[in-house]
Amino acid sequence: MNKIFIAFLFSNLSFLQCSYIFEPVIEEVSPVKIFEDAWQVADENYPFFTFKNIDWDVIYQKYYLKAKNTQGDEILIVLHNMLGELKDGHIWFYTNGGKRIKPFYSPRTLKDRKAFSLLVVQKYFDKKLSFAGGKRFFYGILSNNIGYIYISTFKNDRTEWYIDFKNIISRLKNTDGIIIDVRNNEGGSDIVTHYVISFFLQQPIKSPVWVDSQGNKSPEYWINPNKRIKYLKNIVVLQNGTSFSAAEEFVNIMKELPSVTTVGDTTAGGSGAPEDFRIDGGFIIHIPTKALLRYNGEYFENTGISPDI
C-alpha cells in the first residue's frame, strides 16, 4: 500500500472532523513494536472489555501480521483499525508528528451533530441571547419567564467560567423555571460538571461510581449544594446524541433530582475517563482507564442515557 492510497483512504474520512495528515514513523522503532505497545496499553487499562464482549487476544492475532507486513506510515492504519474495534469515542492517538487520529464516533453523534443550531433557538427569544464564559454559555429569558442556559462545554480552561455561571444563575433566580441545554456539548471536566450541579441541590448528592479495568470502585464522593445560591424550581435538561462524556455525567446526576425532567434524544454513550500513554515511536495513545456507571450500577457506554421525554 503506497502513501498515495493511504492519503486517499483517509481523506474520505474528513467528515469526521479529524486530521489524517501522517508523519513518517521513526525508522528506529519497528511497526510491530509500535503495534504491541499500543495493544498492551489497552490490554492493561481499558475497562470495557467484558461489557463489550471483546476478546483482546483475538484482536492481537487479527492485527499482528498486518503490523509485521507494514512499511512506513502504514502502521497508522493498523493502529486506527485495531483501536477502532473498541468502538469508543474517547479513544484516539497522536502520531509522532502531533496529528490526532480518532477511529470511532458514536452513530448518534454523527446523526445529531448538525441537528442543533443556536440560530434556531434564538427565534424563541424576543431579545438576542447573551453570552458569557468566553462564549461557553448563552442565556436569556423566554416571554413566559422561563430561563434558558446553553452550556456548550464543561471544559475548565477559562477562569471566568465559574464566576460567569454563578452570575447567570443570579440573573435567572426569579424565573419560574430554567431550561438547561447540553445538546452538542461534548464534555470536559467532572469538576466543572459538579460545580454547575451544585446550584440545583437542596442537599448533598452522592456522585456516580467509577470502576477501573480491575473492577475497583472509586472512593465515595459527595457533591454539596452551592453555599451562596440555590435554584430549586423546576428544570428541564435538553440532551441529544452529541451530548457526550462529562455532559452525560451531568445528565446522569441531574436525572436524580426531583425537580429535573430530561428531554430530547439518547446521549452519545461515552462514559470512560481517558488518560494519555506515551509509547515508542513518538506516539500517544488516549484511552479510558475508568468507566462511569449509572446510579443503578449499569454501564451506559455506547448505549447512552435515554431522556425522560
For the regions a language model picked out, list residue spans one by one.
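C-terminal soluble interaction/assembly domains
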Residues: 255, 264, 270-277
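Gly/Ser/Thr-rich loop/hinge elements
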Residues: 188-236, 242, 272-279, 285, ...
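Flexible, low-complexity junctional segments that flank or bridge functional domains
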Residues: 18-178, 182-198, 202-208, 216-220, ...
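Anionic group-transfer/hydrolysis microenvironments
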Residues: 152, 183, 242, 266-267, ...
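Cyclophilin-type peptidyl-prolyl cis-trans isomerase
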Residues: 247-264
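Bacterial Sec-dependent N-terminal signal peptides
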Residues: 1-25
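Low-complexity, Gly/Ser/Thr/Pro-rich intrinsically disordered linker/tail segments
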Residues: 306-309
